[in-house]
């Protein structure tokens, strides 16, 4: 019986947004079709990201599936796939709410992998731990690309050496994206410094920050300019509001530099011509572009698709080697109602220094 091929059920359960713009558990959702170059996954755990909570209104495709981060068990393998077998464990990201593939989202009982934005879960890593990584890996890689910084080399024993310290300011250093980015920066030979609340200082330092500052401290921009000898050139804003943008611009050294945020930033706060600006857009990691409303809409790009493939090949190796750690977890057991409740916790900002993961119970 174990040798019989997997046949998807006629229906599955998924989390979606209905015609009334309400997040709803859909018990009669369709199952996706398996492409030849992908694998079919029974979802075992999912992580909830702030972006998941924003898929409403113009960002929602009614009855498309929600969810980016998943980890699960391979139940079927496409005919062109040779390196994965049924029973293997994988983790990856989905392009949620995509109108071209409405039945592919992480918040479902079954999904199929997408592009090359997935990897095999190494031994010793649980489904819950693996599910916490995909969005962080993808966003960290995109941020480094936009800052003009190279990705780590998975084969290097030591990070590359620079003639003098090259600092990167990470504003919001206790966020899930920040903790992955700081590790990757360290592995690329850069020195992260971070801002966050004092109760998360140890977390930021454990993920690579050389120094951590209380974001509420007076005259902090000047403190950082002094710490970096007025030579700070790179700033990643993981919060993205008027205060964070203004602060990052003030902390960058006299010669200017590069500012990247995780969302469109308030342009009136970007006050220095010597500082270049950009912001990350998650779906670009697939090379598929985005159909979201302006300013998020973007055409597909083969260059971005190739970058996503390269990033995930590197990051997958780093995770396997134990050199890239996940964010601290808050794990809850349950089903799709628990995912829905978790989205509300994340939307309200009720977590600090933790990634919310739901371990899905069996049918």
From Swiss-Prot:
UniProt EC number: 2.3.1.161
Biological-process GO terms, alphabetical: lovastatin biosynthetic process
Reaction(s) catalysed (UniProt annotation): holo-[lovastatin nonaketide synthase] + 9 malonyl-CoA + S-adenosyl-L-methionine + 11 NADPH + 19 H(+) = dihydromonacolin L-[lovastatin nonaketide synthase] + S-adenosyl-L-homocysteine + 9 CO2 + 11 NADP(+) + 9 CoA + 6 H2O
Biotechnology: Lovastatin acts as a hypolipidemic agent that works as inhibitor of (3S)-hydroxymethylglutaryl-coenzyme A (HMG-CoA) reductase (HMGR) which reduces HMG-CoA to mevalonate and is the key step in cholesterol biosynthesis. Lovastatin, simvastatin and related compounds are widely used to treat hypercholesteremia and reduce the risk of cardiovascular disease. Furthermore, statins such as lovastatin were found to be anticancer agents.
Annotated InterPro entries: ADH-like_N, GroES-like_sf, NAD(P)-bd_dom_sf, PKS_ER, Trans-enoyl_RdTase-like
Enzyme's top EC category: transferase
GO molecular function: lovastatin nonaketide synthase activity; nucleotide binding; oxidoreductase activity, acting on NAD(P)H
Pathway: Polyketide biosynthesis; lovastatin biosynthesis
Gene ablation phenotype (knockout): Loss of lovastatin biosynthesis.
Binding site for NADP(+): 51-54, 174-177, 197-200, 215, 262-263, 280, 351-352
Region of interest: LovB-binding: 226-272
Keyword annotations from UniProtKB, A to Z: NADP, Nucleotide-binding, Oxidoreductase, Transferase
Chain's role: Trans-enoyl reductase; part of the gene cluster that mediates the biosynthesis of lovastatin (also known as mevinolin, mevacor or monacolin K), a hypolipidemic inhibitor of (3S)-hydroxymethylglutaryl-coenzyme A (HMG-CoA) reductase (HMGR). The first step in the biosynthesis of lovastatin is the production of dihydromonacolin L acid by the lovastatin nonaketide synthase lovB and the trans-acting enoyl reductase lovC (called the lovB-lovC megasynthase complex) via condensation of one acetyl-CoA unit and 8 malonyl-CoA units. Dihydromonacolin L acid is released from lovB by the thioesterase lovG.
Subunit structure: Each MAT domain from the lovB homodimer binds one lovC molecule to form the final active lovB-lovC megasynthase complex.
Record-stated family: Belongs to the zinc-containing alcohol dehydrogenase family.
Name of this chain's protein: Lovastatin nonaketide synthase, enoyl reductase component lovC
Lineage: Eukaryota, Fungi, Dikarya, Ascomycota, Pezizomycotina
Gene name for this UniProt entry: lovC
């Amino acid at each position: 019986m174990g040798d019989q091929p997997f046949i998807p059920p006629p229906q599955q359960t998924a989390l979606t947004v209905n015609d009334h713009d309400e997040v709803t558990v859909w018990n009669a959702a369709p199952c996706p079709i398996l492409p030849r170059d992908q694998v079919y996954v029974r979802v075992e755990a999912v992580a909830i990201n702030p972006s998941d909570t924003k898929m409403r209104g113009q960002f929602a495709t009614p009855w498309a599936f929600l969810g980016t981060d998943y980890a699960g068990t391979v139940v079927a393998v496409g005919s062109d796939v040779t390196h994965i077998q049924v029973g293997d464990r994988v983790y990856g990201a989905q392009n949620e709410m995509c109108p071209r593939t409405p039945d592919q989202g992480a918040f479902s009982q079954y999904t199929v992998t997408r592009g090359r934005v997935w990897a095999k879960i190494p031994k010793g890593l649980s489904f819950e731990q693996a599910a916490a990584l995909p969005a962080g890996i993808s966003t960290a890689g995109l941020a480094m690309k936009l800052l003009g910084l190279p990705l780590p080399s998975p084969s290097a024993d030591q990070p590359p050496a620079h003639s003098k310290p090259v600092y990167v300011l990470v504003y919001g250093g206790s966020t899930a994206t920040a903790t992955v980015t700081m590790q990757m920066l360290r592995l690329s030979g850069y020195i992260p410094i971070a801002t966050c609340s004092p109760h998360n200082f140890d977390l930021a330092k454990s993920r690579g920050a050389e120094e951590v500052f209380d974001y509420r401290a007076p005259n902090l921009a000047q403190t950082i300019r002094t710490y970096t000898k007025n030579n700070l050139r790179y700033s990643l804003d993981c919060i993205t509001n008027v205060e964070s943008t203004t602060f990052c611009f003030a902390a960058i050294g006299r010669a200017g530099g590069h500012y990247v945020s995780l969302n469109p930033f308030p342009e009136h706060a970007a006050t220095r011509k010597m500082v270049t600006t950009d912001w990350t857009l998650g779906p670009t990691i697939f090379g598929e572009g985005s159909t979201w409303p302006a300013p998020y809409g973007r055409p597909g790009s083969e260059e971005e698709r190739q970058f996503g493939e390269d990033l995930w090949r590197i990051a997958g190796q780093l995770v396997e080697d134990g050199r890239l750690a996940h964010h601290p977890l808050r794990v809850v057991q349950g089903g799709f109602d628990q995912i829905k409740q978790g989205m509300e916790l994340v939307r309200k900002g009720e977590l600090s220094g933790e990634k919310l993961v739901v371990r899905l119970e069996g049918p």
